[in-house]
Amino acid sequence: MKVEDYFHDILRERKIHLTLIDPEEQTPEEAVEIARAAIRGGTDGIMLGGSTTDSSELDNTARALRENIDVPIILFPGNTTGVSRYADAIFFMSLLNSTNPYWIIGAQALGAATVKKMGIEALPMGYLVVEPGGTVGWVGDTKPVPRNKPDIAAAYAMAAEFLGMRLFYLEAGSGAPEHVPEEMIALVKRCTDQILIVGGGIRSGEDAARVAGAGADVVVTGTVVENSDNVEDKIREIVEGMGSV
């Protein structure tokens, strides 16, 4: 089954949770243990990537995951090095509010042939960085959307939808002190029919409930997993929070 179809099947019943693993933060073996714990906690898939990912570390981690877990592995590339044949799909995304054309379409053009050759399912996605933006905001030369300007985010989302992007990601940044504002999530969801993904600053079941309740179809957590002593329990808390709305 294609990953996009998998998403739609789940969304007929409930929200989706994805766990983000950065290959540079642990060994492939440790990544497998994190993924297994997250799956036991209720996650629906593993996102793999980071803002500064090394291709060899990514490939080794993707292969280890492929051999040991059954949920989809979705690449979350920070550059052209963020591609591996061992993944099921890739968020083929444009960093919409970058000031550098490289991140809007240049890197995508450079990586497209590799994705095609490897036969990875490409999920067309608009990616928007919201204040504070974190590492991705700095690396990606962005003008982060102000937290009190939901209409700007909605305008980007509608433009992305009209350009054919079927997914839209609101990103507060890895380790952000707060998640994307609920008003912004709600307005974007009202304005488009895209699968709406929200990540950054989601640390608790309460955070996840607010984000999902505002309209997020997919909730992503990463830093909270890296910092947790009990990944299974933390993911379960977040997934249960999402299920409460």
Curated annotation (Swiss-Prot):
Gene Ontology molecular-function annotations: magnesium ion binding; phosphoglycerol geranylgeranyltransferase activity
The EC number(s) this enzyme carries: 2.5.1.41
SUPFAM superfamilies attached to this UniProt entry: FMN-linked oxidoreductases
GO biological process: glycerophospholipid biosynthetic process
Effect recorded for residue 83 to G: Accepts HepPP as substrate
Enzyme class label: transferase
Stretches that traverse the bilayer: none
Function: Prenyltransferase that catalyzes the transfer of the geranylgeranyl moiety of geranylgeranyl diphosphate (GGPP) to the C3 hydroxyl of sn-glycerol-1-phosphate (G1P). This reaction is the first ether-bond-formation step in the biosynthesis of archaeal membrane lipids.
Protein name as it appears in the record: Geranylgeranylglyceryl phosphate synthase
